[in-house]
Amino acid sequence: MDCPHQDVLHLIKYFRKEWPVVSDSERTTICGADNMLLTLQLALAEVNKQNGKEFSVSLSDVLLTWKYLVKHKLGLACEDTVVPKDYADIQKTYDLFLKNSNSLDLIDIYEKISTAGSSEAHFLSSEQLLDFLTNDVCLSEGTDFPIVSTPCKNNLDTVKVKPTLKRIFLAYLNLLVNAKNDFALAQVLNCPERGLGREAFTDLKHTSRLKNMSIFLVATSFIRTIELGGKGYAPSESDPLRKHLKGLSLFVHFIDRLNEIFGETHDPRTAGELLLSTIKMHLIKGRGSGDPLSEAATEVAQDLDLRIKYLINLVSEDKSSGTTGISPVRPKIRAINRGTASGGRETIKTLLKLLDEEAANPPSKNKADLLCADEENTLFGAFSLFTLFRSPEQTGSSPKALSQRVQKAINKDKPKLKHNLIRSQFACTYKDSNLTQTKQWDFPSMSQVPSCIHPAPKIVPVLCFDEEPLENDLQKGLKQSSGNIDLKTAEQVKNKPCKNVGNKRSKRKQVDIQSETTNGQENEPPQKKAVVELTSSKANKQGVSRNKASKNKLITGQAKLTSFFRV
């Protein structure tokens, strides 16, 4: 053939014909040249992240690794070729991505057919496949080029969004055929807007790795468990998927709605038309008829519908002529689930042919537009693959964000208020918190002002001729701190002779001890018991002086009786 594109398509058709020999699943999807490049970009970024770097990769590194990967898998790499750094890990991650998505790339299909010993593989050599994947290939003479008219506002918008809308339609169809394809799910998870952004995709990705399931099966099982499982089987409240319950429910129910079309519609033409119409109406819901996105979605749906009908007509012509080369169809008289599960089998085969034709397309010429998608400009809420898979992974040992760590340190230094600042009448029974103590030091009362933090014992000179002024000062201090002392008792103490110097010294020592005790308990509220003890101790110390005065003390009413009898 003149064009490698037709050879690649012929190779894929033979793979579908002999799939029981070369593949494990009939619904294995094929990864085209563009998807191979996107998968390699994700593998490179994942390896960089495992090596302690960011989840990112430069465009030049992707293109250099891409050329070496294609040559190495085809066995055309020279010995003196420079091997990219960490190539073994990159290839392992690349193959793991494809395996988890139940997909095969074009090189894998070529190797499987060559290993099977089929003569069909000789129609396309490894050098031709290398040129097809790495270089700009020649197009056949009959290839139709899109004719673009003079740019206007509506036409320019339609031309820009058409390729993106086509990928969205094909991703939905790919997910219906192959439920394990995580790349197809990533393109349509939030398209249209369902509130399932990067955070939701990250939570789904982590859960799928823990359960060793595809992302779509994780979302489906989560919704089914909530709807049908009951309280005993419901997910825990700490499940990270619970906060995305509404969006996941909308997504799963829409896929269920598309799957119902397979079972209810037996004609593949009608089923394909209904599928495309349902996807289109779901995308343009809420938009006017003159909206550029609505017009572009309508055109893309019509083009895909025509291609599906064309493929069905080709199969009908081949069956009528009997030149298909495919084994005859088994009789359906005793087929299990006739009209239900097997009703959409022809539709699935038609969709697989449509997806295979897209996989056989040559790679995009502008690699920068393909790999470096605009993160801010999202159509219908759909993010690029690299943006979704770049979401940070949080584990138990992963450090938190810097803002969270700074806020935690600030909150740790702040004193916590345990009790209300308005103190009740029972405040003396509470233990003051650090904040209350700080407030007391900022605004102390007159009875709590300390002279110093560690007061030394006061040296009071005791002289007989200078005792009276010292007693006056002492009495003033006692009057301020103890209001329950009788004034008469204070006057008696003041008029005592100088011979009671020992008692006065003991009083001064007691006052000093009391002051030290007060300084040690300044944070405690003043208690009346201390005043009572001070008064009783003073009375005990003055017992000797009161014995003399008690001899002349009269009983109540004794003075009146004495004056009466004297008369």
Curated annotation (Swiss-Prot):
Keywords from the named record: Cytoplasm, DNA damage, DNA repair, DNA-binding, Nucleus
Compositionally biased tracts (Polar residues): 512-524, 534-552
Primary residence: cytoplasm
GO cellular component: chromatin; cytoplasm; nucleus
Compartment(s) of residence: Cytoplasm; Nucleus
Region (Disordered): 485-552
Presence of keyword Phosphoprotein: no
Gene Ontology terms, MF aspect: DNA binding
A GO BP annotation: DNA repair
Function text: Required to suppress inappropriate homologous recombination, thereby playing a central role DNA repair and in the maintenance of genomic stability.
Similarity annotation: Belongs to the PARI family.
Protein name: PCNA-interacting partner
High-level lineage: Eukaryota, Metazoa, Chordata, Craniata, Vertebrata
